[in-house]
Amino acid sequence: FGSLLGICLLTQIITGLLLAMHYTADTSLAFTSVAHTCRNVQFGWLIRNLHANGASFFFICIYFHIGRGIYYGSYLNKETWNIGVILLLTLMATAFVGYVLPWGQMSFWGATVITNLFSAIPYIGQTLVEWAWGGFSVDNPTLTRFFALHFLLPFVIAGLTLVHLTFLHETGSNNPLGIPSDCDKIPFHPYYSTKDILGFALMFILLVSLALFSPNSLGDPENFTPANPLSTPPHIKPEWYFLFAYAILRSIPNKLGGVLALAASVLVLFLLPLLHTSKQRSMTFRPLSQILFWALVANLLILTWVGS
């Protein structure tokens, strides 16, 4: 899935650049500029649908990638793993600021709710939130800085990806048995490069099918209404890929406790290399660990379902 993540990033940067050419980062124009892109720009609708659904595929791939890393003990490549977790955090930040840009109802209220979480930080919280907003509520300054961040962060992700690969290159990649595979090494090209094309093709078929047949199935219908600070939508919820974290946040009655639990749900990945106690690297021959692993997967799926 690593190669798929790379191609996801490339696709998102290309479609994003094309969208940025037609986008206006201003509260009075953002929503109409997105509508204009979809109606009047050649293939604008397609570019936007690919970009919006490409984000979903990015997260599908990264969750599979992390799951596989946990299952096969890849986290023992500590540097690679830690940079991977930082990549995940950067991706989540990018997706969040990007979701605010169309300036629909859910964009606005999502931004309000999530940035408000920073106010739970003792002592500096409120100052921090007003500093992030550039005022006393989510408004024009917030939108413009979010656009700047959404433009910048994908390139940060690309840079971190290179570091991620450099550290991976130090040790070589892992395998399902978790044993050294030096004797089985083969040239990357044409073998792996050809194998990766199959994954690219399958993912593109799925992505294009989704973008062409039901482009709005993963989005929130509230976002077809321009942002209105005076009317709160009945259910504020993020895109599906954040629902597990949002469910954790909402399930804890205390604000600071919820924020800490939400942060911990992702940051716990940093602890995995320290918590590995088995003599074997991979879970292939560890049925007990397998049960725990699949329980974790089931938990995440249930949280995602509950969160919606």
Swiss-Prot record:
<keyword id="KW-0349">Heme</keyword>
<feature type="transmembrane region" description="Helical">
    <location>
        <begin position="1"/>
        <end position="21"/>
    </location>
</feature>
<feature type="binding site" description="axial binding residue">
    <location>
        <position position="164"/>
    </location>
    <ligand>
        <name>heme b b566</name>
    </ligand>
</feature>
<dbReference type="InterPro" id="IPR005798">
    <property type="entry name" value="Cyt_b/b6_C"/>
</dbReference>
<comment type="function">
    <text>Component of the ubiquinol-cytochrome c reductase complex (complex III or cytochrome b-c1 complex) that is part of the mitochondrial respiratory chain. The b-c1 complex mediates electron transfer from ubiquinol to cytochrome c. Contributes to the generation of a proton gradient across the mitochondrial membrane that is then used for ATP synthesis.</text>
</comment>
<feature type="transmembrane region" description="Helical">
    <location>
        <begin position="81"/>
        <end position="101"/>
    </location>
</feature>
<dbReference type="Pfam" id="PF00033">
    <property type="entry name" value="Cytochrome_B"/>
</dbReference>
<protein>
    <recommendedName>
        <fullName>Cytochrome b</fullName>
    </recommendedName>
</protein>
<dbReference type="InterPro" id="IPR005797">
    <property type="entry name" value="Cyt_b/b6_N"/>
</dbReference>
<feature type="binding site" description="axial binding residue">
    <location>
        <position position="65"/>
    </location>
    <ligand>
        <name>heme b b566</name>
    </ligand>
</feature>
<keyword id="KW-0813">Transport</keyword>
<dbReference type="GO" id="GO:0006122">
    <property type="term" value="P:mitochondrial electron transport, ubiquinol to cytochrome c"/>
</dbReference>
<keyword id="KW-0679">Respiratory chain</keyword>
<feature type="transmembrane region" description="Helical">
    <location>
        <begin position="146"/>
        <end position="166"/>
    </location>
</feature>
<dbReference type="GO" id="GO:0005743">
    <property type="term" value="C:mitochondrial inner membrane"/>
</dbReference>
<keyword id="KW-1133">Transmembrane helix</keyword>
<keyword id="KW-0999">Mitochondrion inner membrane</keyword>
<dbReference type="GO" id="GO:0008121">
    <property type="term" value="F:ubiquinol-cytochrome-c reductase activity"/>
</dbReference>
<feature type="transmembrane region" description="Helical">
    <location>
        <begin position="256"/>
        <end position="276"/>
    </location>
</feature>
<dbReference type="Pfam" id="PF00032">
    <property type="entry name" value="Cytochrom_B_C"/>
</dbReference>
<feature type="transmembrane region" description="Helical">
    <location>
        <begin position="45"/>
        <end position="66"/>
    </location>
</feature>
<keyword id="KW-0496">Mitochondrion</keyword>
<comment type="subunit">
    <text>The cytochrome bc1 complex contains 11 subunits: 3 respiratory subunits (MT-CYB, CYC1 and UQCRFS1), 2 core proteins (UQCRC1 and UQCRC2) and 6 low-molecular weight proteins (UQCRH/QCR6, UQCRB/QCR7, UQCRQ/QCR8, UQCR10/QCR9, UQCR11/QCR10 and a cleavage product of UQCRFS1). This cytochrome bc1 complex then forms a dimer.</text>
</comment>
<keyword id="KW-0830">Ubiquinone</keyword>
<dbReference type="InterPro" id="IPR027387">
    <property type="entry name" value="Cytb/b6-like_sf"/>
</dbReference>
<dbReference type="InterPro" id="IPR048259">
    <property type="entry name" value="Cytochrome_b_N_euk/bac"/>
</dbReference>
<dbReference type="InterPro" id="IPR048260">
    <property type="entry name" value="Cytochrome_b_C_euk/bac"/>
</dbReference>
<keyword id="KW-0408">Iron</keyword>
<feature type="transmembrane region" description="Helical">
    <location>
        <begin position="288"/>
        <end position="308"/>
    </location>
</feature>
<keyword id="KW-0812">Transmembrane</keyword>
<keyword id="KW-0479">Metal-binding</keyword>
<keyword id="KW-0472">Membrane</keyword>
<feature type="binding site">
    <location>
        <position position="169"/>
    </location>
    <ligand>
        <name>a ubiquinone</name>
    </ligand>
</feature>
<comment type="similarity">
    <text>Belongs to the cytochrome b family.</text>
</comment>
<keyword id="KW-0249">Electron transport</keyword>
<dbReference type="InterPro" id="IPR016174">
    <property type="entry name" value="Di-haem_cyt_TM"/>
</dbReference>
<dbReference type="GO" id="GO:0046872">
    <property type="term" value="F:metal ion binding"/>
</dbReference>
<dbReference type="InterPro" id="IPR036150">
    <property type="entry name" value="Cyt_b/b6_C_sf"/>
</dbReference>
<feature type="binding site" description="axial binding residue">
    <location>
        <position position="150"/>
    </location>
    <ligand>
        <name>heme b b562</name>
    </ligand>
</feature>
<feature type="transmembrane region" description="Helical">
    <location>
        <begin position="194"/>
        <end position="214"/>
    </location>
</feature>
<feature type="binding site" description="axial binding residue">
    <location>
        <position position="51"/>
    </location>
    <ligand>
        <name>heme b b562</name>
    </ligand>
</feature>
